[in-house]
């Protein structure tokens, strides 16, 4: 077992010509630290100092599953985001909020979880949160949207878990809605390989199958490409402000704004189409994903989301 407080170990990893420096000079642009809450502050201090001494733009992101501003481990409150350690963290709280909303449609709980992180995190950390909805530690997103906690089932159940055609189509609709949130909440979207191609699976090791070269779900792939283009066209999604607008009746809405550019994101988790009546600044404006007609309201299909730009 490694003692991360050991001076020689810290020197080996973070010292001059150490492991951190080696891979940065080889072309890496930063690090994601696995299970950062199991690393002591002394190690994190020296590691992050070493990385930043080479280039202040190099990024260090830690794997923290809870709110990183009040995480308790190693016998005390951690100082990840106080300015001398991590730049940001993997955003498991947002992932949990998105998945739970997609499964159960409780809008109020979703917004409460998101607002809590937005209020607690420094703006610099908030803007570079690693927003994922699937990782090597979780069940595949398509499977997880239909089967809650599948990764905790016996392996003989997980190995045979494959969505029916009806379940798959429902999961795809929920995935598309979920990814709109993933791509528009504060932070940057991170995609676990294969999610953009329709890969299914339970927990480890069933979430680590080969990429389906030649058998990708082109509809899902094209959806991710479309969202990527929308995101890249909007500066307000890089580091704009976030404001909740509404959260009720299985529907959520929020705005992002920066330097005069403003969008409203509306997600409908209901099993039916809704008419969402808009504030004045978004009436008769442009819907960016589908080109949906916008008057003083917008029609949003079941399990779907829209992005409306005010100007």
Regions found by a protein language model. Give the residues of each.
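Aromatic- and acidic-residue-enriched carbohydrate-binding clefts of CAZyme catalytic domains
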Residues: 1-4, 21, 154, 158
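Active-site-proximal helices and loops of the catalytic beta/alpha 8
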Residues: 18-21, 29-129, 181, 198-226, ...
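Short, solvent-exposed loop/turn segments at secondary-structure junctions
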Residues: 24, 29, 37-40, 65-68, ...
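Short beta-strand segments
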Residues: 31-34, 61-63, 131-134, 192-193, ...
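Aromatic/acidic polysaccharide-binding cleft in carbohydrate-active enzymes
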Residues: 75, 131-163, 179-217
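Carbohydrate-interacting/catalytic domains
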Residues: 76, 171-172, 184-191, 197-311
């Amino acid at each position: 077992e490694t003692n991360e407080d050991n001076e020689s170990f810290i020197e080996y990893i973070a010292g001059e010509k150490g492991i951190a420096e080696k891979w940065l000079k080889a072309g890496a642009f930063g690090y994601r630290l696995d299970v950062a809450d199991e690393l002591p502050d002394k190690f994190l201090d020296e590691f992050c100092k070493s990385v930043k001494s080479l280039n202040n733009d190099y990024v260090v992101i830690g794997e923290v599953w809870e709110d990183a501003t009040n995480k308790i481990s190693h016998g005390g409150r951690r100082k990840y985001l106080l300015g001398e350690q991590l730049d940001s963290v993997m955003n498991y709280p947002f992932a949990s909020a998105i998945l739970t909303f997609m499964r159960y449609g409780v809008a109020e709980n979703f917004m409460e979880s998101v607002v809590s992180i937005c209020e607690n995190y420094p703006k610099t950390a908030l803007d570079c949160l690693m927003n994922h909805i699937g990782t090597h530690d979780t069940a595949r997103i398509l499977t997880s949207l239909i089967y809650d906690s599948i990764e905790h089932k016996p392996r003989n159940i997980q190995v045979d878990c494959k969505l029916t055609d009806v379940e798959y189509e429902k999961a795809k609709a929920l995935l598309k809605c979920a990814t709109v949130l993933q791509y528009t909440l504060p932070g940057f979207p991170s995609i676990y390989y294969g999610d953009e191609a329709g890969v299914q699976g339970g927990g480890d090791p069933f979430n680590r199958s080969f990429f389906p070269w030649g058998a990708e779900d082109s509809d899902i792939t094209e959806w991710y490409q479309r969202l990527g283009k929308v995101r890249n066209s909007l500066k307000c999604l890089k580091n704009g402000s976030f404001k909740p607008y509404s959260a009720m009746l299985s529907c959520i809405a929020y705005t992002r704004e920066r330097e005069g550019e403003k969008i409203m994101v509306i997600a409908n988790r209901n099993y039916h189409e809704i008419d969402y009546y808009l504030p004045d600044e978004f009436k008769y404006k442009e819907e960016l994903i589908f080109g949906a007609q916008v008057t003083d309201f917008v029609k949003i299909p079941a399990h779907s989301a829209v992005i409306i730009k005010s100007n």
